[in-house]
Amino acid sequence: MTQAQTAAVQPDAIPVAAPTPQRWRVADVVALFELPFNDLMFRAQQVHREHFDANAVQLSTLLSIKTGGCEEDCGYCSQSSHHDTGLKAEKLMDVDAVLEAARAAKASGASRFCMGAAWRNPKERHMPALTEMVRGVKELGLETCMTLGMLEDEQAQQLAHAGLDYYNHNLDTSPEFYGQVISTRTYQDRLDTLDRVRDAGINVCCGGIIGMGESRRERAGLISQLANLNPYPDSVPINNLVAIEGTPLEGTAPLDPFEFVRTIAVARITMPKAVVRLSAGREQLDDGLQALCFLAGANSMFYGDQLLTTSNPQSQKDRALFERLGMRASDADAMSADA
């Protein structure tokens, strides 16, 4: 066999499915990252087409229902009370205001409505309003997601009874890099909340942030952690760091955009039936790079001009990109794997 022939078959040495049931070693994930770019993209697109319509993307809208004043010290976050970002803390929004925003999101084409609160964890006094928000958004025909921080068992059950479809609680990064980003919440705290959410019967939305100064191996460590959750998340948001002034990470050098695309592809291969979502930082990607992300297996994105406290590409621009690519927005029901 010639050298060229050998090189051509090397990507096939990297398994499409997990090397052992439900297990992806960090070394296996690193091997995926290190494939030639075209080979990685081809593999990811194969996996994507096996389970999803490759030209359909779910549009999600994210609303900050309680902004600022968070007692956690996440190094990337403008809403932490530990950082001087000029953001003023606000109270929890009224239910009617949230439902008005949800109606506007639906009118603009979104099929999923996500509600985020800057808390370490919700207080019991907040639960009636939160469950009313879930019920109200569900009545509009939108898929619902919340991210409220850590949950107790009873709180997870209350949200489940209200009909919450997804709960988001990100791992943020690998266990090895985690301590350089946050000190007020442990990695195990995050895993425990995911267990409570899953036990309550709510779908898990869990991903992370890349470009915080971590190494490629540490990015692979995040993907390995996500892929080895049992089961892996139903929804995987991948955030590209937005280095916000006043946060400890404000001076972080931007990630190579092709590394971001690689991360999307590796997430698709290791979690073949998950919805992989382009999240914060999409504004830093030009149209060509976003198209590569869709080719790599991203099939959902946050849609609208604002994500919590950071900007996002305008909705009209997103619609124009879809038209140029021959892609279309899909409703929530159509995003189930193998649908």
Swiss-Prot record:
Pathway: Cofactor biosynthesis; biotin biosynthesis; biotin from 7,8-diaminononanoate: step 2/2. [4Fe-4S] cluster binds at residues 70, 74, 77. It comes from the Bacteria. It catalyses: (4R,5S)-dethiobiotin + (sulfur carrier)-SH + 2 reduced [2Fe-2S]-[ferredoxin] + 2 S-adenosyl-L-methionine = (sulfur carrier)-H + biotin + 2 5'-deoxyadenosine + 2 L-methionine + 2 oxidized [2Fe-2S]-[ferredoxin]. Its EC number is 2.8.1.6. Residues 55-282 form the Radical SAM core domain. Keywords: 2Fe-2S, 4Fe-4S, Biotin biosynthesis, Iron, Iron-sulfur, Metal-binding, S-adenosyl-L-methionine, Transferase. [2Fe-2S] cluster binds at residues 114, 145, 205, 277. Its cofactor is [4Fe-4S] cluster; [2Fe-2S] cluster. One of its GO terms (biological process) is biotin biosynthetic process. Binds 1 [4Fe-4S] cluster. The cluster is coordinated with 3 cysteines and an exchangeable S-adenosyl-L-methionine. InterPro entries: Aldolase_TIM, BATS_dom, Biotin_synth/BioAB, Biotin_synthase, Elp3/MiaA/NifB-like_rSAM, rSAM. Catalyzes the conversion of dethiobiotin (DTB) to biotin by the insertion of a sulfur atom into dethiobiotin via a radical-based mechanism. Homodimer. This is Biotin synthase. It comes from Burkholderia vietnamiensis (strain G4 / LMG 22486) (Burkholderia cepacia (strain R1808)). The gene is bioB.
